[in-house]
Amino acid sequence: MAAERLNSILSHLRPGNKGVAAITQKNPDDVVITLSLRTPLTKARKGGFKDTDLDYIVYALLKEVIAKSQIDPALVEDVCLGNVRSTIKPSAQLFKYDSISVNDGKAAYLVRAASLAAGIPHTAGASSVNRFCSSGLKAVQDIANQIQLGAIDIGVAVGAEMMSASGDRLNKPFNDEVLKNQEAADCMQPMGQTSENVGKDFNISRAQQDVYAAESFRRAEAAQKEGWFDDEIVPITTRVKDPKTGEEKSVTVSKDDGVRYGTTVDSLSKIRPAFPQFGDKSTGGNSSQVTDGAAAVLLMRRSKAIELGQPILAKFVGATVAGVPPRVMGIGPTAAIPKLLEKFNIEKNEVDIYEINEAFASMAVYCVQNLGLDHAKVNPRGGAIALGHPLGATGARQIATILSEARRTKAKVLVTSMCIGTGQGMAGLFVNEQS
């Protein structure tokens, strides 16, 4: 194994060994994805997961990973959860200790317990990461890094967010000394304010944003009607409570519920601004939906995948993060994507599909324009405006979606990216290996 890893490293260091030809090479030491799936995405506080807790959905998803991959769970060496706001109380569906509370920032407790309950033995590790909206991709990167370093052979990355049970508010202002720095103070700006800043600073009109949003809904509607989401989604059985009677019943959630069929530019233009105190361009129709959901990615060393007879869906090439001014955090992908492509000497037109998170139409329009991308290549199945944006899940959800689309279209070079609160962007590069 050490010799394989050394040869792989040396191959990357050879002069001229960059570009598409380099990233599409297959080496025993590559990090590969053998399974990528997600739950349906449902409306927060209204949809099928409104009464489902974070620990339960992670548990249910990990059980699906084991069942669908047919991997021996004893071979899993680490599980990493990307999550922004963990729920307050462990699920009564899974754990029977009503006196225990798990506070925000304690997602590591939840993922450890959920992984054990799902059948992954205590010999595996578990951890959580939080880089806001890139947390799912960050979890993938963390598992991939361990594989690349030889620390583990197999790991699972999960991204999950149950926004029905949590918000995203900064409860305590920063220290006065910290606030003397304007960019530090800007980190406290609400996301809606940063969206309006992007619209104002870069002249992204309300009409442009509504046109973009309508197209996101159109694409998502078409994809859902054609059944394109079916192979990336696993149905999840959970319980929902009737808000009037308090009665609980078991339901199986099998499809995204945020796609509004028949959405048009005209219908979007009639929606009132969502953040009138900051501006008049961002609305509930051209911004991402508040959503519950989760996604998981099974990663391993290529040689191990071949040994186990696991199907190789894609190669994880790399991921990177970049910073931008916090007050316009939405433009993060315009820094992260070029940085990523430059590292691997890839031209933007050599990428077949881009998944760029649609936190707000303002940032989505700006990113497509600023990067000079062919919009047809960006979010071909729609994005967060139509599907929803469960914060910690998005980075992993995008991988499930882009690999499904690549399987359908035979696309090869794939990029996922998202903006990140406080002024960052992250991007990941993948090579589709599905026939």
Positions of the model-derived regions?
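Beta-strand segments within the central parallel beta-sheet cores of soluble alpha/beta enzyme folds
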Residues: 74-82, 96-99, 126-130, 157-160, ...
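Flexible glycine-/small-residue-enriched beta->alpha junction loops
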Residues: 144, 148-202
